[in-house]
Design a protein with these regions (language model features):
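Periplasmic c-type cytochrome electron-transfer domains
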Residues: 9-89, 96-118, 223, 230-239, ...
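Extracellular low-complexity, Gly/Ser/Thr-rich intrinsically disordered linkers
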Residues: 218-308
Length: 308
């Protein structure tokens, strides 16, 4: 597979790994108060699910529509059985397809998508972890060791919190933004046709202090969503854990090759894309054994829905 997704135009790729829509309904609104957190997309630029849903339709590397009217026009001629256009007009009308209604209908469409993404189809909580929490299952010794490391020496829970708080379910994220020192992904450069620097939150806020920071993702169903990180630079959960464990221990890869170096993730790590704002306070030299890395991966796989 590729580290980023191809849109409707063959050969045209996005520049970030697609985040999951599952459990996105629990992401709080984007806020600057009390520490920057929340919002949709990797950089938080959409305040909520409806705002996020309005983006891909007009993105030239995703759905490649040029106007809101073009999108609503496609809904009007939709061939879905049962008369989708009639249903849309009932929900978003009156006169949802009239030219003067385009903006209202476009927003209504996005709110409908957001409502769908808020249903239990997108937040079933049917993982082994949930079954253990409910007393209906038990972890294996390896999985339990992984959880103990996750909340202890591996320091994963420092950001991927295991306490939902306020009656919220456990989502394994603080919804904040971090720069963990990831390298650029030159495979993405090959797909999009040009090198670039992804400023993340700093680009959205036009604030150099936030350059290279991306929203901390939840870990529900994380075993189903490789590759990993905002640019897909890490190919497996094992490689993710190994990066956190050895980022500051392994030597740097050949700078001419970056993550294309054959030793990437094994004998070296490529240099961070944006080192100036990198968080080096609690990761990079965790001194975990190979077996302990495997245990953390085993625990994270218990977060997959339908595994019980």
């Amino acid at each position: 597979g590729t580290p980023v997704s191809q849109g409707v135009v063959p050969g045209r790729f996005g520049n970030r790994h697609s985040p999951s829509a599952a459990y996105a309904v629990f992401t709080p609104l984007f806020t600057l108060k009390g520490g920057i957190q929340g919002g949709q997309f990797w950089d938080g630029r959409a305040s909520d699910l409806a705002a996020q849903a309005r983006g891909p339709f007009l993105n030239p590397v995703e759905m490649n529509n040029t106007t809101r009217g073009q999108v609503i026009g496609k809904i009007q001629i939709s061939p879905f059985e049962g008369g989708y256009a009639v249903l849309f007009d009932q929900v978003c009308g009156p006169n949802a397809f009239a030219p003067e209604s385009v903006d209202r209908s476009y927003v209504c469409m996005s709110e409908a998508i957001a409502a769908f993404e808020g249903t239990t189809l997108f937040r079933p909580f049917t993982s082994k972890f949930d079954a253990v929490q409910a007393g209906r299952a038990s972890f294996t010794a390896q999985e339990q060791n992984g959880l103990d490391l996750f909340t202890g020496n591996a320091k994963c829970a420092h950001c991927h919190t295991v306490n939902g708080g306020g009656g919220q379910p456990v989502l394994f994220t603080d919804f904040k933004f971090h720069n963990i020192g990831l390298p650029e992904n030159r495979r993405v450069f090959q797909l999009v046709g040009t090198p670039f620097t992804d400023l993340g939150l700093g680009g959205f806020l036009n604030d150099p202090r936030q350059n290279g920071k991306f929203k901390n993702p939840h870990l529900r169903n994380v075993g189903l969503t490789p590759p990993f990180m905002h640019n897909g630079v890490l190919s497996s959960l094992k490689q993710v854990v190994h990066f956190y464990n050895t980022r500051d221990v392994l030597p740097k890869c050949d700078p001419a090759l970056g993550n294309l170096d054959p030793g990437f993730g094994v004998t070296c790590w490529a240099a961070p894309e944006i080192p100036g704002t990198m968080d080096s306070s609690f990761l990079g030299d965790l001194r975990l054994t190979d077996a302990e890395e495997d245990a953390i991966v085993a625990f994270m796989l218990t977060l997959t829905d339908g595994s019980m």
